[in-house]
Structure formats: C-alpha cells, structure tokens
C-alpha cells in the first residue's frame, strides 16, 4: 500500500483507500488506529449492515472522525518519505467485539464534516463499482474473453459491453427492489 500511495501522491492522483492495518505516524507516537480513537466524533451516521453468509443484518451507529496525518515509511522502506494524507474514520459505537471500523485514507482535503461525509459516501459506493466490473468483465458480458485483433474494435466493443453491463446491473437492482416490496 505504501508504494501505491507514494505513486499516487507523486503523480498528483486522487485516491480513497481503506487502511486494513494500523500504520505508524510521523507526528504521533501512537499508530493510526489509536490516533483515530482519540479524535473527537464530529457526526453520527446510521447504517444498516445487510445479511451476508452467516451474519445477520443489523443497524449500527457510527462515529465519524477526521484529521490530517503523515504516514511513516515502513522500516524496510527507508528510502521513502512520509506520505501526508487525510484520515476519515467511521467507527461503530458500543462494546461489541466485532465492531465495524472503516479507516479511510484520502488525498482529498477534509476541512469539515461535509467533506468527511462525502468521502464516506465514495467508500459506500465501492460495491456498486465492484458489481459493475464483475458484470462487465465476467458474469454478464464476459468482455475478458474477447479475442479481437484490432485495438479500435476492442475499444468499441468494450464500450458497447459496458452499456450492456450497466443495463444488466440496473435489472438486477430492480429485481432486488421488487423482491423487497
């Protein structure tokens, strides 16, 4: 992840990523997740976690927090400089041991609660994007199996298949909504 974020910053590319491990910070002795716990909550967000596999659906309340930090280069990557990022956290309230915790890192400036909520909204939409790619690449149109010789033909057909994938995804959502009503 560190190399990826370094590349994104060096090329002034925007990003929102979820940190899956607590990282060392340059400006604090504590790690990212401990730093996040100490931040004040600026908003409460309600979220319904859908049923999946053996997990039951549940409603949760999340504390929204944000700040600016510099990620310290890992010990085995001393040649890298620290990476300044904005942190947005969505941490489930309560005492459950399996609490939801989204630790998001972004290049987008976070100056207020509205900025933080916008980043959370981007992250919440990740499943829609992943579903689109799944339908486009393999499940629905199988664009990956195309064996065209011409780059132009491949581009044209990819665009057509992307349109078809969008329609297939819309039909799936309409079916799911219909089943709920």
Region spans (language model):
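Single, function-defining residue in the core of a domain
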Residues: 1-181
């Amino acid at each position: 992840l560190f190399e990826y974020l370094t590349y994104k910053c060096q090329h002034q590319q925007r990003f929102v990523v979820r940190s899956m491990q607590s990282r060392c910070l340059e400006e604090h002795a504590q790690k990212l997740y401990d730093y996040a716990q100490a931040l004040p909550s600026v908003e409460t967000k309600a979220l319904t976690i859908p049923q999946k596999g053996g997990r039951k659906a549940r409603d949760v309340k999340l504390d929204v927090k944000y700040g600016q930090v510099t990620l310290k280069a890992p010990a085995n990557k001393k040649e890298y400089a620290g990476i300044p990022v904005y942190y947005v956290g969505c941490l489930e309230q309560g005492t459950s041991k399996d609490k939801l915790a989204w630790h998001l890192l972004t290049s987008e400036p976070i100056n207020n609660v509205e900025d933080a909520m916008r980043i959370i909204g981007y992250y919440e939409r990740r499943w829609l994007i992943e579903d689109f790619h799944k339908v486009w690449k393999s499940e629905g149109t199988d664009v990956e199996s195309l064996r065209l010789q011409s780059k132009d033909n491949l581009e044209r057909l990819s665009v057509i298949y992307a349109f078809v994938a969008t329609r297939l995804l819309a039909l799936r959502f309409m079916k799911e909504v219909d089943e709920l009503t």
